[in-house]
Amino acid sequence: MDCRKMVRFSYSVIWIMAISKAFELGLVAGLGHQEFARPSRGDLAFRDDSIWPQEEPAIRPRSSQRVLPMGIQHSKELNRTCCLNGGTCMLESFCACPPSFYGRNCEHDVRKENCGSVPHDTWLPKKCSLCKCWHGQLRCFPQAFLPGCDGLVMDEHLVASRTPELPPSARTTTFMLAGICLSIQSYY
């Protein structure tokens, strides 16, 4: 493979990953008003609208000027009923989750979201497709432009836990991504 083809291939892979992230963020945006879908491990997850009391003033500072109250109670007095999986309820609004758990109420377990031996949010190249483990499902995108694929997408049966067949909407997205990649390749 000459240098030009390698550069085109690299750009195509970068575009696929960027478009995939955009679709993921689009799915995340549908979860709720300014709610973080998955904070990084150790971070605190909270909804933006839950940190203000019901009797908030008519004039609110811009979100960049908000300061969380510092009066967190002693651990013996904390209300732990709002959190699952050993999380600590803070200000009766959000949870500080233990490692491997996340979500508003520590309801999601990272350990259950892997695809067999493939960790969550990991890309896995397979013959003529590029797969990603996302919340326990291995989702594959055809890569018909790869050398040796000759425009054909090979039907691969990948072994992973909890990996159902893609729904029709995901297939449409996959073909749309493949079309975008092919148009990018033909442009160069």
Curated annotation (Swiss-Prot):
PROSITE patterns: EGF_1. GO terms for molecular function: activin receptor binding; growth factor activity; nodal binding. GO terms for biological process: anterior/posterior pattern specification; blood vessel development; determination of left/right symmetry; heart development; nodal signaling pathway; signal transduction. It is found in: Cell membrane. Disulfide bonds join 82-89, 83-95, 97-106, 115-133, 128-149, 131-140. It comes from the Eukaryota. Keywords: Cell membrane, Disulfide bond, EGF-like domain, Glycoprotein, Growth factor, Membrane. Gene3D superfamilies: Laminin. This is Protein CRIPTO3. It comes from Homo sapiens (Human). The gene is CRIPTO3.
